[in-house]
């Protein structure tokens, strides 16, 4: 009698738009479609890392219930429009950007003056409408975070940092806009009692739907690994000197990072075959690699950061015994 559980063998991704996709996984044992679908959905909505405006300072405005001469929108609507701007930061956790515009016309997210390591995903997003003689001068603080953080948590949690005219925003950091899932019937040979999991994911463009589901799965695996390593107190006391376990992600080849062909070839030319090899190198060491420039380095750092890793890390007992080169 078979006792092992089925694992999905078919994973199909159907693009429904630039940041919208349907992911189909099958087959699952009966009941596992809802078990995993609900868990992934909750993680996708609550635990993904993203970027959001958190503080705004507008010239001539003391509080959010003000109005500005020459600006059609009041400050409340202006703030709502600013919260709709989708930012993406590279290799930093926060940045302050400036929006200055004068004269009649439409103000869009593309008018924001950006630092070199910050980009706007939706530059056509409308922020305000200026009439003749109108002027807008705004400082926007953008931060990296997770989930949803109400503005009053920071407003009252930093008494010493109060600034007149600074408006603290509720921040929705999650790059995932909508997630839904459905469980359908699947069949393998004569078995017809299996599950097919269909997930519908839409993001704001900071990450792709495929990357969102990959990250959510890693979060679940990381949380559940604590239970997989569960030991009794007696067993733990008997083996206090056990060698530290190596994170399985470090044993994966650098090809799994899905770098550009140029970056991947440069790493292999330096005998960097595994993620564990890569994270032990410093930025200066990588920049000395032939044909690997600053753009490739930033790509590598960004991909590692999405997995909670950085360059220059120290590993004990590396490489592990039996690791093929």
Swiss-Prot record:
Catalyzed reactions: RNA(n) + a ribonucleoside 5'-triphosphate = RNA(n+1) + diphosphate
E.C. code: 2.7.7.6
Alpha C-terminal domain (alpha-CTD), as annotated region: 246-325
Pfam families registered for this protein in UniProt: RNA_pol_A_bac, RNA_pol_A_CTD, RNA_pol_L
A GO molecular function held by the record: DNA binding
Enzyme class per UniProt: transferase
One of the protein's GO biological processes: DNA-templated transcription
Region (Alpha N-terminal domain (alpha-NTD)): 1-231
GO cellular component, one term: DNA-directed RNA polymerase complex
HAMAP family cross-referenced by the UniProt entry: RNApol_bact_RpoA (MF_00059)
Domain notes: The N-terminal domain is essential for RNAP assembly and basal transcription, whereas the C-terminal domain is involved in interaction with transcriptional regulators and with upstream promoter elements.
Record note on quaternary structure: Homodimer. The RNAP catalytic core consists of 2 alpha, 1 beta, 1 beta' and 1 omega subunit. When a sigma factor is associated with the core the holoenzyme is formed, which can initiate transcription.
Family, as annotated: Belongs to the RNA polymerase alpha chain family.
The name this protein goes by in its record: DNA-directed RNA polymerase subunit alpha
